[in-house]
Amino acid sequence: MNSKSGYNRLFDPMAETGQALDFSQHGLGQKTVGNPFSAKAKMSVRNLNVYYDDKQAIHDVSLDINRNEVMAMIGPSGCGKSTFLRCLNRMNDTIENCSVNGEVTLDEQDIYHKKQDVVPLRARVGIVFQKPNPFPKSIYENVAYGPKVHGLVSRRAQLDEIVEDSLRKASLWDEVKDRLFSPGTGLSGGQQQRLCIARTIAVSPEVILMDEPCSALDPIATARIEELMAELSQNFTIAIVTHSMQQAARVSSRTAYFHMGRLIEVNDTRRVFTNPEHELTEAYITGRFG
């Protein structure tokens, strides 16, 4: 299927979008197209279904997320991508009327097993939310909190080292090293989000989930976070939900397109944007609906 240079059109705000189309029921009974599975998977999802009371939000989704990749998840508002992301570290457990069935594994171990403790799971699979949410503590204590709670340190020198290393990895150290005991809430929005990333890194996660991490930030702060994602992917597996197709195109190696709770297509990012296999994907990335 030819998307007429859909990848390039993402960066052209004046591109012709064509006539709006209603694809709301088109092709939804078909299997996911593209390449959702991998021999290099860090996390694997099989036949995942999610319900809020009797409303089904995710329909039979299967997908692998590779080690040390940035996987982007795109789709219209309400398509289920954030619900899917929260299944990867069981954040949906905190929603009273939410039920999940299917299989989600981390290094081939079922994270929904009845004996799985969610506290160490969420240390291994951290999450950065849409809006920066630093604790009402100092910059230092924001980063130190996780290692102390999880018993990762026994000496203050160890904690100091973790705080500095985490802030460096989050590209924040040089900006805050002289005011570590100032309130984290006093930082700019972009700095607060990088502080939240440092806080996540501090407990040595294996996977970092990002749910619209730049939606509340200005373009300069967004660029810093995007650069940071590329650096972090050398040591971490990253899954990001974004409404910005431009961002998905810039930061990710693979992209998954969701529509009405179904995973429509997964493939290398450039291929998704230049030669999508499904009409729904093509219609979305070329602006014909969304």
From Swiss-Prot:
Key words of the record: ATP-binding, Cell inner membrane, Cell membrane, Membrane, Nucleotide-binding, Phosphate transport, Translocase, Transport
GO cellular component, one term: plasma membrane
SUPFAM superfamilies from the UniProt entry: P-loop containing nucleoside triphosphate hydrolases
Signal peptide: none
Enzyme Commission number: 7.3.2.1
Residues that, per the record, bind ATP: G75, P76, S77, G78, C79, G80, K81, S82
Protein's name according to its UniProt entry: Phosphate import ATP-binding protein PstB
Alphabetized Pfam families for the sequence: ABC_tran
SMART domains in UniProt: AAA
Alphabetical list of Gene3D superfamilies matching this protein: P-loop containing nucleotide triphosphate hydrolases
Function description: Part of the ABC transporter complex PstSACB involved in phosphate import. Responsible for energy coupling to the transport system.
Domain of life the protein comes from: Bacteria
NCBIfam families listed in its UniProt record: 3a0107s01c2 (TIGR00972)
Membrane topology value: Peripheral membrane protein
Reaction(s) the record says it catalyses: phosphate(out) + ATP + H2O = ADP + 2 phosphate(in) + H(+)
Species per Swiss-Prot/TrEMBL record: Pseudoalteromonas atlantica (strain T6c / ATCC BAA-1087)
Subunit annotation: The complex is composed of two ATP-binding proteins (PstB), two transmembrane proteins (PstC and PstA) and a solute-binding protein (PstS).
GO biological process, one term: phosphate ion transmembrane transport
